[in-house]
């Protein structure tokens, strides 16, 4: 019971003391001795001769929106040229003075942060700390200037005229005596962007018994050679394009031979005439099959260049810009 009573009495005394301090100390009575805060540290005192005890020092800093500084914070301010000639309370419970140069009247000719341990009831000034300060000296704003590198870029525009001329290419089949038609496209206007051209000519020779396809790819002269031969025509691989052309030529040749050999009158006048033509064609095919083995054995002994069978040649050319 006695312990509870003593605890209540202690709390009541603390609360009463705090009310007395808050009621007796006002912000109008305070004076800031050091107007410029160094590293957030300033010295606060009362305008009257009577100064502050340790409890009043905490309350004075609080009324100004600050907090009671610690000894380490005062030492940091000392390194930034913070110097006073008055002792003041710090949060460690004793008073200190910050001195850069010795002076008999200030700190007894001492240098640095000098400590003086006294009872908390003694009255001194107070060292208050502002945690929101970012400048070394609050009176001298620090302007951070960032110099952006200036690049003097001089762009030299050089225009080179490229005259692309297509040479005349003559493609002929070794199995035909008919020369292929020549292709001479007009030279394009000069431009600053070099262009590459490919001229793909496919010569198709149609014979009665066989079809020969020859492909040539003359390359237009240019300063830069093609580094990747697998690059295709307009995004399509060259091999696929060649195969497509070969299949197309073969189909066209077979169709031509079929029309030339079997179809004599088109369209058919009536169904009876069509049946007669089909029957005649079947009889001719049977005769041709009987005579084919003998003819094939004879053709194998002959050179393809000595063939006297008539042939027709067509040339298809494609020009593409790469």
Swiss-Prot record:
Pfam families: Xlink. GO terms for biological process: anatomical structure morphogenesis; cell-matrix adhesion; hyaluronan catabolic process; positive regulation of cellular extravasation; receptor-mediated endocytosis; response to wounding. Residues 260-322 are cytoplasmic. GO terms for molecular function: cargo receptor activity; hyaluronic acid binding; signaling receptor activity; transmembrane signaling receptor activity. O-glycosylated. Residues 20-238 are extracellular. Residues 40-130 form the Link domain. It comes from the Eukaryota. Keywords: Cell membrane, Disulfide bond, Glycoprotein, Membrane, Receptor, Signal, Transmembrane, Transmembrane helix, Transport. Residues 1-19 form the signal peptide. It is found in: Cell membrane. The chain crosses the membrane at residues 239-259. It is a single-pass type I membrane protein. Glycans are attached at residues 53, 130. Residues 279-309 have a biased composition (Basic and acidic residues). Disulfide bonds join 61-128, 85-106. Homodimer; disulfide-linked. Interacts with PDGFB and IGFBP3. Forms a transient ternary complex with PDGFB and PDGFRB in TGN. This is Lymphatic vessel endothelial hyaluronic acid receptor 1. The lineage of its organism: Eukaryota, Metazoa, Chordata, Craniata, Vertebrata. The gene is LYVE1.
């Amino acid at each position: 019971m006695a312990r509870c009573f003593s605890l209540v009495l202690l709390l009541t005394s603390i609360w009463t003391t705090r009310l007395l301090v808050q009621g007796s100390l006002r912000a109008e009575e305070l004076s800031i001795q050091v107007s410029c805060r160094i590293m957030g540290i300033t010295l606060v005192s009362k305008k009257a001769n009577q100064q502050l005890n340790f409890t009043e020092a905490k309350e004075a800093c609080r009324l100004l929106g600050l907090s009671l500084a610690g000894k380490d914070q005062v030492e940091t301010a000392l390194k930034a040229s913070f110097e006073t000639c008055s002792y003041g309370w710090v949060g460690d419970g004793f008073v200190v003075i910050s001195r850069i140069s010795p002076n008999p009247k200030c700190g007894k000719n001492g240098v640095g942060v000098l400590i003086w341990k006294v009872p908390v009831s003694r009255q001194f000034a107070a060292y208050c700390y502002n945690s929101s300060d970012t400048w070394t000296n609050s009176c001298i704003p620090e302007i951070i200037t960032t110099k952006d590198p200036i690049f003097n870029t001089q762009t030299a525009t050089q225009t080179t005229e490229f005259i692309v001329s297509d040479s005349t290419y003559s493609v002929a089949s070794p199995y035909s005596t008919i020369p292929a038609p020549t292709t001479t496209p007009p030279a394009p206007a000069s431009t600053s962007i070099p262009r590459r051209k490919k001229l793909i000519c496919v010569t198709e020779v149609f014979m009665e018994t066989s079809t020969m396809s020859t492909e040539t790819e003359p390359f237009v002269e240019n300063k830069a050679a093609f580094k990747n031969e697998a690059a295709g025509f307009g995004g399509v691989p060259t091999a696929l394009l060649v195969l497509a052309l070969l299949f197309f030529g073969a189909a066209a040749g077979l169709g031509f031979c079929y029309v030339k050999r079997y179809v004599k009158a088109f369209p058919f006048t009536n169904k009876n005439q069509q049946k007669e033509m089909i029957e005649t064609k079947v009889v001719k095919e049977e005769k041709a099959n009987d005579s084919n083995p003998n003819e094939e054995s004879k053709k194998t002994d002959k050179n393809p260049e000595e063939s006297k069978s008539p042939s027709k040649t067509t040339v298809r050319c494609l020009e593409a810009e790469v």
